[in-house]
């Protein structure tokens, strides 16, 4: 299963709010410049009111949760999975399967800030994570041009069927807190759109069930 | 499904290390006294070297991850689940199903510190979470005296069978980062001990699959 977390709400603090007190004090506290820290709704909420599309931005916790669910899964540990993070503003984060994502959120944030600063992590030796410019369309093309989407309005499948369908697919999940894909074509050109249950699930919940279904299908659980 | 996260690695900083620089500076930075903040391996590692059983302490992120997986699940949202946190040092944290756990880890830590300070959260109105003294044995007795355990050395069951077995059970999962239950009787007196896959899983991974299996069994996914 290749998981693509799309339009993920992770980015460095945009220039237009560098001088906002909520941002400046957070950066100073952490000994960094405002442009070097991740935008975080939990810390920078007062500064985000005027940001375009602000409700869908500043949620690195979504990426953290999904990476924890995926990287520590049996699917990934058995070499049957790979995850790519496509971000708002068109960056692609590649994560090698053996990458142990920090379980502590603050350590994860520091790792992501290093990644944005250097384009790779760790700074030396074999890179485990890499960041480069890239569009969602380009990534999906690179991954073979065929994908399925997990979406609240998708078709319901029995759990076992869903697992079989996802195990060998490129699976796109939205990495944003609210609303829908800005890239409408992701849904329109998908080979299939599946829902997981009858209610909207956040990204980590959807990925948890997709991975469990694929693992059950592969006989891992 | 009633989930009991047992011997969870969450506690306030113990008195013996209040004066350690790593603790004192963290408390000062957060405007709190050392005895009011959660012990956190990611922040207080230098202070924990001499702590008894230190390798199994100071991991509130484990409780956070499990609560996120459980509280935002379809199982819980449909009223088919309930979670209790039993902590190291014998506290019991009760969490009402409608409790929306903060997705941001730092906000979660603040909520837990309020809970330890006041015994409840939020401070006024209907409480959503409550903390009180209590043993694991007392809790399991209160919940009917019959339980199953998820454990790496448990019996493997097909995913569908596991779901059916867990859906209407009290399910105990270890809330500690390493090692095994200190309460050996938890395993010895359990009605059944199940494993999820052939490799050890961290608590959140085990709970993610247990919940997905129970949901599939209940026809929710």
From Swiss-Prot, chains A, B:
Domain of life the protein comes from: Archaea
Keywords, comma-separated and alphabetical: Methyltransferase, Ribosome biogenesis, RNA-binding, rRNA processing, rRNA-binding, S-adenosyl-L-methionine, Transferase
Family of the protein in this entry: Belongs to the class IV-like SAM-binding methyltransferase superfamily. RNA methyltransferase NEP1 family.
InterPro entries, sorted: Alpha/beta_knot_MTases, Rbsml_bgen_MeTrfase_EMG1/NEP1, Ribosome_NEP1_arc, tRNA_m1G_MTases_N
Gene this protein is translated from: nep1
Protein name (record): Ribosomal RNA small subunit methyltransferase Nep1
Entry keyword annotation includes RNA-binding: yes
Keyword Cell inner membrane in record: no
Reactions that this protein is recorded to catalyse: a pseudouridine in rRNA + S-adenosyl-L-methionine = an N(1)-methylpseudouridine in rRNA + S-adenosyl-L-homocysteine + H(+)
């Amino acid at each position: 299963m290749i998981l693509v977390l799309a339009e993920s709400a992770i980015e460095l603090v945009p220039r237009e709010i560098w001088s906002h007190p909520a941002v400046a004090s957070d950066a100073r506290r952490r000994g960094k410049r405002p442009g070097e820290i991740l935008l975080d709704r939990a810390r920078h909420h007062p500064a985000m009111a005027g940001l375009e599309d602000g409700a869908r931005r500043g949620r690195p916790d979504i990426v953290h949760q999904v990476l924890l669910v995926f990287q520590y899964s049996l699917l990934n540990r058995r070499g049957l999975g790979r995850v790519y993070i496509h971000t708002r503003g068109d960056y692609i984060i590649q994560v090698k399967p053996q990458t142990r994502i920090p379980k502590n959120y603050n350590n994860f944030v520091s790792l992501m800030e290093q990644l944005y600063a250097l384009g790779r992590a760790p700074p030396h030796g074999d890179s485990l994570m890499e960041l480069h410019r890239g569009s969602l369309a380009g990534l999906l093309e690179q991954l073979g041009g065929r994908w399925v989407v997990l979406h609240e309005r998708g078709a319901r499948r029995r759990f076992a069927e869903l697992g079989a369908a996802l195990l060998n697919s490129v699976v796109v999940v939205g990495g944003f807190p609210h609303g829908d894909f800005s890239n409408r074509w992701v849904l329109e050109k998908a080979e299939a759109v599946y829902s997981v249950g009858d209610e909207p699930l956040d990204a980590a919940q959807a990925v948890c069930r997709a991975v469990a279904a694929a693992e059950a299908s592969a006989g891992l659980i």
